[in-house]
């Protein structure tokens, strides 16, 4: 549960600062988590560690969902309610996608919505979306409620959690990196819930980066940059690799690691 407006914070981050982090996930109600800063303990807010430039800091965000069905343009919306998609009731579009899925995916982890990050792209795939949950639907109006506000004209595509796709995306993003250490913020919907065994993401970082200096936490939402902007993600592994030998490592850009209540 979130007691801090992470979206507002991320919207104010200067473009020359990189933020990686996550929402504390232990509590079942707002204010139930405990954040520690030096000798002080807080029940809301955020705690951040600012790292200096020049330490080879490289961010990474790997997705945990796979797009299904076709992308649709939102043609009717109100707050977090999608009223129509491509001129048809959103619930009808949702039902069409569900009916096209294999039985194992239909009965599995539920359907999510991906909100396109870069509308200038002509095609969309894994990694091109902000993932949000489908919260419910109204049969009478055909509206679908999701875990985010959405504007008319936005492109969305329904998504399913997919272990194979998630594993490939993380492995691919780590393939060309070596690092001395990494701080990893992984969704609590990954791990054994997605991969069938604990420690999948940590193991990938250890094996691919060639280091055992990997630390982090399970999150109820992950923070990381995609497409040059910072976003609050779902079902991702967001990490800051340190001491990289990557040619894209930081060029005097400070990094912030944040835990949000």
Segments predicted by a language model, with ranges:
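Small-residue-enriched flexible segments
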Residues: 1-212, 217-261
């Amino acid at each position: 549960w979130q007691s801090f407006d992470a979206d507002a914070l991320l919207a104010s981050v200067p473009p020359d600062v990189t933020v990686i982090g996550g929402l504390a996930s232990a509590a079942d109600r707002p204010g139930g988590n405990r954040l520690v800063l030096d000798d002080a303990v807080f029940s809301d807010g955020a705690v951040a560690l600012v790292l200096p430039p020049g330490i080879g800091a490289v961010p990474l965000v790997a997705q945990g969902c796979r797009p299904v069905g076709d992308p649709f343009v939102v043609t009717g919306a109100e707050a977090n309610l999608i009223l129509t998609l491509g001129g048809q009731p959103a619930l009808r579009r949702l039902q069409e996608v569900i009916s096209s899925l294999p039985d194992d995916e239909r009965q599995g982890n539920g359907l999510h919505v991906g909100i396109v990050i870069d509308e200038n792209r002509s095609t969309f795939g894994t990694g091109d979306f902000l993932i949000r949950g489908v919260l419910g639907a109204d049969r009478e109006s055909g509206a679908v409620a999701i875990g985010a506000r959405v504007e008319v004209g936005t492109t969305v595509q329904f998504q399913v959690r997919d272990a194979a796709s998630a594993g490939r995306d993380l492995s691919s993003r780590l393939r060309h990196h070596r690092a001395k250490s990494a701080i990893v913020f992984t969704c609590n919907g990954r791990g054994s819930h997605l991969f069938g065994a604990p420690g999948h993401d940590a193991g990938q970082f250890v094996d691919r980066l060639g280091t055992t200096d990997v630390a982090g936490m399970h999150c109820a939402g992950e923070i990381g940059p995609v497409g040059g902007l910072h976003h609050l993600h779902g079902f991702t592994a967001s990490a800051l690799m340190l001491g990289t030998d990557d040619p894209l490592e930081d060029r005097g850009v400070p990094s912030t690691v944040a835990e949000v209540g």
